[in-house]
Amino acid sequence: MFTAFKRFCVFLLAAVVLFPVGSASADVSLPAPQRTGGSGVFDALGSRASAVGADFASMKDVSLENLSTVLWAATGLNRGEKGWTVPMAMGMEPYVKIYVARADGTFLYDWRAHALKEVSKEDVRGRVGKQDFVAKAPCTLIFVSDSAALSKKFKDDDGEEFAAVAAGAMTQNVYLASGALGIGTRYIRSARDDAIERILSLRDDDDVLCIMPMGVKPGA
């Protein structure tokens, strides 16, 4: 007959087996994005620029507060529960996903919850870009078409054009928000697509659209 102590030991062992330490996901709840203030839209357009590749090595990490604002600018809700910061065809929900590669892991931006959902604890920044400077950036955004969302309205590859157009609007918003926050970034179409597909375990019909390495400029 088990004593109370033996029962406790069995329970503890089962807990360790079923829920090992370190197995829990590390999702990140983002702070509220900045929606007011900053420079005017014409100032932001006037200063929009791509960061020089060599500068990424000296950039600092992007805070969660600033990352929150950049991601919201890219594809966040701005008018209650139905309305985004970028146009989507036929009133659809966003059909381009944004993954965030950081030193502490890789995450998927959840626009509904305005949160980062952990995909991997691995630092993959050095494996997503073809240029050496991408690996030195504190953070990289990865834009991927969402084939599951696109299939609700489009057949075959028709939706890919819409995904590319949406990614264009999203990346421009990233540029403008980043510029207002003192963040340097760069749009890059040429990425290690095959490696990214494996790292993120993408669906067969999901396509890597572009990447944007980023970091806080020195002195910002």
Residues covered by each model-derived region:
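Generic beta-structure capping elements
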Residues: 33, 144-146, 217
